């Protein structure tokens, strides 16, 4: 083995022995039909999130069918506006964009508080764009918390919000494997919600902020922990969402909260 290759192998072995995840060591990692760069600045996308994307795609197609033949309210052209709130590596934004294309999506906005995460997302957008037939719809990366950094002109004109916010509790974090705890803590751990349910604070925050941005009809899809499903549905109904349900993951556990706004008040 050449000396350089041997040195690289030793470095990888040392990183693995220190508990670093394989996804960070080997670089590009599959998520749906994409190969995404992930490193210690972002959460590693998981199969549960792939299923959340499937649910979101169903909502997007439903909204697109309902809007067929009607232009958007802001006069900027046809197609849906989607938001990936807390994008991390850009996995959800890119999965939506690649699956739906510019024929369905006019624009995807991806937000994150972390400058490092947005750097990773930008690199993934650059790499994935040439690999998607017909190219990707416009993807805008903006820094800020949840939906706050969106431009004011989008208020009331967003069609779909999708998010995988932190929902791990403090107690759960303490018991996680060392490998998982190498991922960004701020991307995993959340405080209690308004009702005191552990780990629900950020799920609730996305639900609350989305009301200011999502038009009618519109939808919000949020990943959560199974034990949070009932409380999250209750909160969505309290906030005034018209249709609320939770879809299961591949293991049959409650995983994707869907909160819809109907076409009229």
Model-derived features with residue positions:
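Conserved AdoMet
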Residues: 1-59
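Conserved beta-strand segments of alpha/beta enzyme cores
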Residues: 35, 107, 138-140, 242-245
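Conserved SAM/SAH cofactor-binding pocket of Class I
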Residues: 51-174, 205
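Class I S-adenosylmethionine-dependent transferase superfamily signal
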Residues: 96, 180, 206-210
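Conserved Class I SAM-dependent methyltransferase catalytic core
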Residues: 192, 196-260
């Amino acid at each position: 083995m050449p000396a350089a290759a041997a040195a690289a192998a030793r470095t990888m072995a040392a990183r693995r022995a220190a508990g670093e995840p394989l996804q960070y060591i080997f670089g590009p990692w599959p998520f749906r039909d994409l190969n995404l760069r992930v490193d210690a600045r972002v959460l590693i996308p998981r199969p549960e999130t792939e299923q959340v994307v499937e649910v979101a795609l169903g909502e997007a197609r439903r909204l697109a069918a309902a809007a067929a033949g009607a232009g958007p309210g802001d006069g900027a052209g046809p197609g849906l506006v989607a938001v990936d709130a807390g994008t991390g590596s850009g996995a959800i934004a890119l999965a939506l964009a690649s699956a739906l294309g510019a024929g369905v999506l006019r624009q995807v906005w991806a937000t994150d508080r972390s400058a490092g995460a947005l750097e990773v997302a930008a690199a993934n957008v650059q790499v994935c764009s040439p690999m998607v037939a017909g190219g990707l719809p416009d993807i805008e990366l903006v820094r800020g918390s949840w939906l706050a950094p969106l431009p004011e002109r989008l208020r009331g004109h967003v069609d779909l919000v999708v998010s995988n916010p932190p929902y791990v509790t403090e107690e759960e974090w303490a018991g996680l494997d060392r490998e998982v705890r190498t991922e960004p803590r701020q991307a995993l751990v959340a405080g209690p919600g308004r009702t005191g349910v552990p780990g629900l604070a950020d799920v609730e925050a996305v639900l609350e902020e989305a009301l200011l941005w999502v038009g009618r009809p519109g939808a919000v899809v949020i990943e959560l922990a199974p034990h949070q499903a009932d409380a999250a549905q209750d909160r969505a109904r309290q906030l005034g969402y018209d249709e609320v349900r939770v879809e299961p993951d591949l293991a049959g556990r409650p995983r994707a909260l869907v909160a819809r706004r109907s076409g009229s008040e």
